[in-house]
From Swiss-Prot:
This is Uncharacterized protein C9orf40. Residues 45-138 are annotated as: Disordered. Signal peptide: none annotated. Keywords: Phosphoprotein. InterPro entries: C9orf40-like (IPR042349), WRNPLPNID (IPR033461). Residues 97-106 have a biased composition (Pro residues). Residues 107-116 have a biased composition (Low complexity). The gene is C9orf40. Pfam families: WRNPLPNID (PF15017).
Length: 194
């Protein structure tokens, strides 16, 4: 059995990558569309600066002291505070002010408080199970009836009616006895015909 290349199992199911895996010895590779002249810098390089390696060299000094640059110090250059204390208005490591808490997003059956127009939105509450709610504090945290009626395919469905198990048991017993009687009668008719 022939050995496979490492890229083949990953890319062979993609049609346009199959061509990359095939070896075309008959045709030479097309020339690049644009060849950079030797004096022109690439997009991230300054003019007149010789091209350096892309990867940053890491030495032991920068790894030992991560906050060496003044722009990354927590105290913005003020070293009068002890190192154990942190200012409350700054973030943990970056020195940025803390972000405001994210807004509370409503569940799938609810709306944002400012999403409705002041005039009522124009639909007059059509398609709602209950009256429109005015307070969003406690009601948005509780699971409402519309949330539980929303299925996984994100289509609305009608709620199922309550089912009495006694009715199902009675129906299943009646149909079983009728089916067994019909099965016995059909078996007798088949025997008589042959």
């Amino acid at each position: 059995m022939a050995k496979r290349r490492a890229a083949e199992p990953v890319t062979f199911h993609v049609p346009w990558k199959r061509l990359l895996l095939c070896d075309f010895a008959e045709q030479p590779p097309p020339p690049p569309l644009w060849i950079r002249p030797p004096g022109v810098a690439h997009a991230g390089q300054l003019l007149g600066v010789p091209e350096q390696h892309r990867k940053r060299k890491i030495d032991a000094g920068t790894m030992a002291e991560p906050s060496a640059s003044p722009s990354k110090r927590r105290d913005s250059g003020d070293n009068s505070a002890p190192s154990g204390q942190e200012r409350e208005d700054h973030g943990l490591e970056t020195g940025d002010p803390p972000l405001p808490p994210p807004p509370v997003l409503p569940g799938p059956g609810e709306e944002l408080p400012g999403a409705r127009l002041p005039g009522g939105g124009g639909d007059d509450g059509a398609g709602r199970a209950g009256p429109p709610r005015g307070d969003w504090g406690v009601a948005s945290r509780q699971h409402n009836e519309e949330f539980w009626q929303y299925n996984t395919f994100q289509y609305w469905r009608n709620p199922l009616p309550p089912i009495d198990l006694a009715d199902i048991e009675d129906l299943s017993e009646d149909t079983l006895t009728e089916a067994t009687l019909q099965g016995r009668n059909e078996g007798a008719e088949v025997d008589m015909e042959s």
